[in-house]
Amino acid sequence: MLHISKWERHSNSSRDALGAAALNFCKNAKSKDGVHGAKFYWPNPNLIAIIIEAETGSWGIAAEPDGSTMKSFFDLGDAASCIMDETWVDASLGQKRSDKAS
């Protein structure tokens, strides 16, 4: 699964603070079992996009966060507002779930 989010910098937050929070968030995600990758990108100077690739249930709403994960979320939230948050399911998992309805 891909967990994709976009974060817009608060006007009272520096770009350095946003970049540091995003980096720490990605480092935290990569430290979790089942997370294969976590990167952030700058689409423009006031916006970051975070892409986390993880096995189902190891990141996102289905995973119970620990203290360090919650701190990384809160630190990111102090620097920016989440303006988009999506989970993309790969084709094979999507097909397996669709087949259950048949």
Question: Where are the regions that the model predicts?
Answer:
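An amphipathic, aromatic/His-enriched active-site/gating alpha helix that lines ligand/cofactor pockets
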Residues: K27-G37, I52-W88
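Short amphipathic alpha-helix segments
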Residues: D16-S31
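Solvent-exposed, non-transmembrane alpha-helical starts
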Residues: R15-G19, G60-A63
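Short, low-order "capping/linker" segments at domain edges
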Residues: W88-S102
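Short glycine-/aliphatic-rich beta-strand segments at the starts of folded cytosolic domains
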Residues: M1-S11
